[in-house]
């Protein structure tokens, strides 16, 4: 079932572009599309996306016999006003293609399918193409997927869930020293996709709140899990920030604060069980016992976070290796194999080993479950914003109260991390930009008479950074996401203090690169509000915006130049003009104690309120 049709959201630009198809040439060759450079008169330029060999059947409301037309013929036949009346037609249907391609899809293609001389790499009949600089996104056109509007509905939940899950995952890893550093961690970067996250920020409204309640029983206790989410988007001179406050409340509903922690007593796995269970050690396939390992074996009686041989956070442990004579002296040792090929021995009964297991091997499993929880919350939040709940293709699973319970018992009363820096590339049509993502997390835990509250604060900021060296002299097309633009051999995981950690496409190793020193210089960015472009305001608002102070710069995007506009979307995420200056510095934000107490009022009105008469 397709989402409800909104009144003329994106298609206003497509209608305006309908009369401008005569200035470009396109041909189809082995699934690729090429277009000539735009003429000097860019106002009247729009690329053709179908050549004369591709035909569409046009059905009207009464005539069962279709008319066979190419897309250029269709566009050239109708003026702008006549194009707007094509809504009465049943559909545009490619002759040799079964799924129906509607007028809405054609408008999306006209609006966003931008190609260059390096080809699109998308199926021309079935997919729309979106260009972010050198990055190409193929948007399928199917019964459940309708062009760019569907991109918004798909990418926004993904991006928000990644921001939430990576934020808490980072916080969790720093708490347990998962990679031997209280400042840097690589774990959460495996989940975060900068392109998705930044696009989600652009799509996300300025403020949003959501509350979820889930009842369950544990032993004889009636319990309720309450999840409250507050989201605030801030635009400032340095870039753009999303602040999220996620509150988890575990409530005992059938007593007035008596033994509420019964609702948190889920079965736990001991470190000893993990130590003896290979599947619990992340299910990693272990090398055969009779295979000789040509690798350095590092033996240390020190804590793993203080080993003198290497810093484990630079060489992530990935496997539990069975004991044999080729590894460690005897069975009183346990071996850990790292991604760079090192093997590290520790005595079986040492606390160091247990700490290592709990913070690396067991942490991977815990982090995965935690991120699943946060991803569910993020998906629900985005689905609520987009009103997609209940529609086909929207997957929502229940939030696991056991994971929330584990978070409650594991996290300290209060913990705040320092900023984590993650440098990414944002290539555009104008010039490449080097952006830095700052992530700051914090937790606060409180006890009440009938409940426990855990609050996780996450600040996600994108700012501009620039390099003396042009990273894009050697053009590489087809990046999976923006982070790969800085890594010729793979996607970037993390970057700090001149070091860049990349994961190659072919394996899971971590490779260290050295970057040039970076300097920041002023850069004025033009911008047209994307939320207004896709809103219901229509053509008049867009025309007014073009003349407004927001986009009145000489180089500002015109509503006929959507490829430039999409590029500016990402430049905008990295830098804001000084007129958008945040009045106050970013601070941790938590609700008041009174608001916290209101969070615990039971959802069942028949139950007595723990706060007297229930008036609040």
Swiss-Prot record:
Keyword Cell cycle attached: no
Post-translational modification: Glycosylated by host.
Keywords on record: Glycoprotein, Host endoplasmic reticulum, Host-virus interaction, Late protein, Signal, Viral attachment to host cell, Viral attachment to host entry receptor, Viral envelope protein, Virion, Virus entry into host cell
Record's signal peptide: 1-24
Entry's localization field: Virion; Host endoplasmic reticulum lumen
Residues listed as glycosylation sites in the UniProt record: 23, 44, 282, 330, 351
Transmembrane segments: none
Task performed by this protein: Plays a role in virus entry by participating in host receptor binding at the cell surface.
Annotated protein name in UniProt: Glycoprotein Q1
